[in-house]
Amino acid sequence: MINLLTKTLLFLIVTIGLAFPSQTSCGYCYKKVDGRYIIFETKTYHQSCYQTYIQVKCSHCSKKIDGHYSIYNDKSYHAGCYKKYVQIRCDHCGNTISDAYNIDNDKKYHKACYVNNILEKCDACLNPIEGKYNKDYWGNIYHQKHNDEFPSCDNCNRLMCERITKGGYTIDKKRNICSLCYPKIIVKQSQIINIDKEVKSVLSDIGINNIPSNIPISIVNSMAELDHISTIRLGNVRGYTHYNVNTLAGRKIKEEFHIYVLSNLHELAFKAVLAHEYLHVYLFQNDYDLESDLREGFCNLGSQLILKKDNSIVSNYLLDSMYESDDLDYGKGFIKMNKMLEKKGWNKLLNYLVKLSK
């Protein structure tokens, strides 16, 4: 916010002389002027009337003012009194302010002091930020224009620039991975072994114990490949469970599962996706045919379980992304199922799934 300091300098014009024939009355008492008189701002006064009633007095020291003086907020001051006691001072450098200034949180600053020392600095370019700006989950702030200059990481949504993430890389010209997430990404089958054990252990704690141990888990390199494998349009989904069942006389004789998860996911995101897919397996095993919003919402409860257990800033970011999603299935459906979970708990919710089934 910018205010303009109004500093007015007026010259007190005082002429002292002898009365002349055409002068008839004092501008204050209206009596005839004889002898010495004073002219101030085109009016003539008895010398005593002027000194007693008209002459300007300093609002700080109360002494009479002769010559130049300053007016501020309708009060008059000696130039020295004004500068020393009244004139606004910068809350950063302490020097007086004589022209335009900035107000921030009721403090006043020289424009240069404000821009160079008070304004937030952009984490992408280090220049001061004036006006609107973006702030990410991690506390980084940056000019809005940088959204068009740098990509955002697909895992953490940080701006991929040198000062925020030390850059990153792009996969297939579509997916972006920042250098901060890179050490934690999953790209090899060997990385899955311990993750698989951990996810199954977490699910076992809530009563889901019958997940087959031999389900293959494949890492898929691109969204296009994941779409092709699923044969359905997945949008921004990061995993898919293929299910094949053989029956005889209406009874299951063989079930086959294959889980596909997108590559280059942060380890926590990979765990969350795998937990989601394992709950799909649970639904298939029990023949629970839920509406799509309830189905995906229920499976997202598995992701939530993993992320809450971790309770790191990365997991909290992923959780908040789930809570804020406006997707009808993965967002609103998840919120709906989460309310059921909060009301019933895991044991009752698992038993209640049969009633939710079509």
Question: Each predicted region: which residue ranges?
Answer:
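Classical Sec-dependent N-terminal signal peptides that target proteins to the secretory pathway
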Residues: 1-21
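Short, flexible, mixed-charge glycine/proline-rich loop motifs
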Residues: 20-22, 48-54, 80-86, 111-118, ...
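Fold-core signature of tandem repeat domains
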Residues: 26-29, 33, 37-40, 44-45, ...
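A metal-dependent hydrolase signature that marks the N-terminal structural subdomain at the beginning
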Residues: 60, 91-92, 115-242
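Pan-zinc metallopeptidase signature
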Residues: 119, 147-158, 208, 324-358
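Active-site recognition of the HExxH zinc-binding catalytic motif
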Residues: 203, 272-286, 296-300, 304
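Active-site scaffold of zinc-dependent metalloenzymes
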Residues: 232-271, 278-285
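Post-HExxH zinc-binding segment in Zn-dependent metallohydrolases
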Residues: 288-329
